[in-house]
Amino acid sequence: DEKNKLMSLLSKHGAILFRGFPITGYMHFDSFIKTFGLTNFPYEESFSNAVRYKRTKRVFTANEAPPSVSIFLHHELAQTPVYPSHLFFYCENAPEKNGETPLCRSDVLLSKLQGVIPEFVQSCEKLGVCYANVMPDHEDNKSGQGRSWYSTLGVSNKLNAERKLNTLG
């Protein structure tokens, strides 16, 4: 079964890169993702504030910031309490210049950090990590994280935003 072979390779290597794979558009990509039988992840529930457009219930654009905005290496959806078990990336429109999707295995990075700066790793394990995310009160499509807190939280006012955030702890 090809699906099981791919999932085994994914587990072993952390990522699979398909080059020249015959995907002809986002609908075809959606069908490809569906064959894996994974639980669908609704982006709307993620609390990510990147501006993305929904193509299908499984496919969203990566980020609608202009090409001049640098988006640095980051853990996808790390700042959110709800996240998918797997991520699939597909390039529908290649940029005219530059354009990269760097991948980094967190387990490998952690192992290297433990070898180079173990005191830092121990400090993080002891103290934990806290994310602060300041969101605008209006949409800003010129930013890599330009969804407003209204849109990100799916609310219409501050009171409902506070209620929603309080349910998350």
Enumerate the language-model features and the residues they cover.
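Non-heme Fe(II) oxygenase catalytic core, chiefly the N-lobe of the double-stranded beta-helix
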Residues: 1-169
